[in-house]
Amino acid sequence: MPKIKKKGQAGAAKNYITRTQAVKKLQLSLPDFRKLCIWKGIYPREPRNKKKVSKSATASTTFYYTKDIQYLLHEPLLQKFRDQKVLEKKISRALGRGDVSDAARFERHAARPEATGKPRYTLNHVIRERYPTFNDALRDLDDCLSMLFLFANLPSTSAVPAKMIARCERLCLEFQHYLIVSHSLRKSFLSIKGIYYQANIQGEDILWLVPYKFNQRIVGDVDFRIMGTFVEFYMTLLGFVNYRLYSSIGLKYPPKFDQLKDENGAELGAFSLEGVNMATQGETKAVTNGEEQQQGPDPKVQAEVDKIIKQLKEDESKSDETAEEDAEADDEEKPTDSIDKFEPVAPGGDVLPQPAYSSSDPSQLFANFTFYLSRETPRQPLEFILRAFGCKRIGWDSVLGEGAFTNDESDPSITHHIIDRPVVQAATNEDGDGEDNQTAQKVGPNQRYPGRIYVQPQWVWDCVNDEELKSPELYAPGAALPPHLSPFVKAAPGQYDPTLPLEAQQTEAEAIEADLEDAEKGNAEDGSDVENDMDVDEAEDDEEEEEGDEEDAEEAEEEDAEEDEEESKTLQRQLELEAELQGKKVQNTKVDSKTKAKLEQRKALEKKAREEAEDLERAKGMLSKKKRKLFEQMQYTNNKKSAQDEKLRAKRRKLEKEKAQKA
């Protein structure tokens, strides 16, 4: 007889452990257990059957893998938490006994970061364990940057100390400096939540969100203890990443930081970057110069060096002669700068995207310009984006902080002026003659400096996303800005694409309906009656009969006119019925040949759609029940998407018509 297994010794009951059991096993408090799980990347699991897993009568809600908790038993941070817990117990017992001297002694020997400056524990080994390679750390950098940029803009409270905010801000500015030097920034988008940025670092696309520089309110329903635990981990991670990135481009980390400039609002200007070998090069130069002054070169060594240099020159002359001969032989096969075109091998094959050649570097888009930022513009994101795309000279008003190229708005070297204020009518003199904007010495409302381009801030973002300089006239102060589209969303084939013209993506049925609506509106504006049109037609027919010579031709013309009249009457009845069904006013209008053709096309399309629907229903009848349900779900989703796209196209068509009427 086989041995009967005890309940809870194998299977799911052994693979899972409740949170209460895990806390008891690790001998930790619940807040420390949460911290440890967040830092080590251990998350709750959902078993298939909670009744089989739960060993108690009460239903447990949080479960972990037993192997994960077993893995935490060997964590060095566990001993740090235990030591801190023991120390707190000793201090509380001493105070309970009234022994203040012992409590003070325990306090002095404790590791206090605020007093000693040394951290109570470090997370360096956790970073190395969770991210074995640098690319793994880059893939997990999205949430890290979003969280740190968020905390860098928060006000200091008891839950969010000022030191944490300052460190977050410093790490973020160091990361931005790397993006500026390496030109790794690719795209940016202004949204309601904040500003999205996308950078490409060593082949990895990193997307993060930066909130706007507004005063943030701290609400009580947010648990900043949990968020602070994540921030503590992310600060260590970004410190590692910044060090690796700076080292990869030969910069010293951390960069020099000027506290006084930072207090005056310099931000990016408070840092000064240095190369790794700058200090050592200076020392070696000084040493070699001193040696050269004390000792001269050895004459024997100098003679051997001269001999070797002479032989090298002879070899170079021979190689030049052979190179000229090879160049003459290869003149017939000169390489061209043209780019190869990828053409499909067979008809109906895949069409590959063609390579694009651009002589201009997108990373140096603003390199030749000098910008001036008005006081109402967001200085921090504009400065970062302009510097990341090659601009070296950015000025702003002294109210916005230090670090500007110039604080003089009338500097003649300024080429672009970014302004975001409404257009104000310029005041006129008593004589009625307004002051010339180009010759004004003092800039007043709605006055401009000559030879300077004035644009709104959106111009910078659209130029960056399209990798080309947009027309400044579209972004002039007071002008209606073009739509700011997200560069991260690419329209799928068949979906509505706002960048394409409406005619290129609307269906044939939509185009016919739009033409018929235009024709109805035009006829309603004309107000012509069918009876008057009939009289005119009959008069024309009479004239033709008088001019006609042959009776057969006259009879044929009469028959054609009668057929046209019958067709026009039937179409007129159809339009009247449609107007009555839609609740519109019935008008007697003449149906011209174009409208007839459109109506016939619409009839043909409706007939074709009915036939396709019937064929589809017959095909669905051949499917199994399971496949039929799946197909109906797919069909419902596609119809819903097409209806949304149709609404967007109709809205755009209406806006374009209104715009054309105003123009």
From Swiss-Prot:
Subunit structure: Component of the NOP7 complex, composed of erb1, nop7 and ytm1. The complex is held together by erb1, which interacts with nop7 via its N-terminal domain and with ytm1 via a high-affinity interaction between the seven-bladed beta-propeller domains of the 2 proteins. The NOP7 complex associates with the 66S pre-ribosome.
An example Gene Ontology molecular-function term: ribonucleoprotein complex binding
GO cellular component entries: nucleoplasm; PeBoW complex; preribosome, large subunit precursor
Protein name listed in UniProt: Pescadillo homolog
GO biological process: maturation of 5.8S rRNA from tricistronic rRNA transcript (SSU-rRNA, 5.8S rRNA, LSU-rRNA); maturation of LSU-rRNA from tricistronic rRNA transcript (SSU-rRNA, 5.8S rRNA, LSU-rRNA)
Entry keyword set: Coiled coil, Nucleus, Ribosome biogenesis, rRNA processing
InterPro entries xrefs: BRCT_dom, BRCT_dom_sf, PES
Residue numbers spanned by region Disordered: 311-360, 428-447, 504-663
Main location class: nucleus
UniProt lineage: Eukaryota, Fungi, Dikarya, Ascomycota, Pezizomycotina
Record SUPFAM superfamilies: BRCT domain (SSF52113)
Coiled-coil segments: 501-663
Compositional bias per record (Acidic residues), positions renumbered to this chain: 322-334, 526-567
Superkingdom of origin: Eukaryota
Ranges for domain BRCT: 361-477
Compositionally biased spans, kind Basic and acidic residues: 311-321, 591-620
Family: Belongs to the pescadillo family.
